[in-house]
Amino acid sequence: SFRSTIISNLMPEPIFRKDYRPSSHLILTTELDFNLGDRETIVSSRIVFYKNPVVTNSVNELFLNGESLELISIKVDGLDVSYELKEDGLFLLNPPDDFVLEVKVRIHPESKTDLNGLYQSSGNFCTQCEAMGFRQITYYLDRPDVLSVFTTKINANREHYPVLLSNGNLIEETNN
């Protein structure tokens, strides 16, 4: 029926333990820089990857989850990189064992209605990253077995957004 088709399309695809494979790479640190705007938000990320020591085979691609993102730029160790865009993410082709990935994307939280990733509600920016919402913010290894230390910077027009509240400890505040 039409209703069951809609419901099945909204349901996430199940992931079974028997299909689990460890990630070829892990993440040491993640730095996020949000430039919040009325019509768009630019998210810049700097992610430090390293080879997972339990994975011994060589890797010719690394899949990063990403949905509803407009890719502006992508670099590995400051250089252009080969990649392949897909609807649900991108493949980095021939990634080094250890590298720094820099990605810049454009997102539109002002027009999101699914309440995942970064979205606006009553004029406030909000995030919902569990279970798979983070992939709507930037390209990332969005899986529960890959952990990282995060540093986040939020930039916004003070007149439009006088209060910026983030989960974590305040490191620095400026009035620019």
Language model features by range: what are they?
Residues 2-176:
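Acidic/His-enriched low-complexity segments
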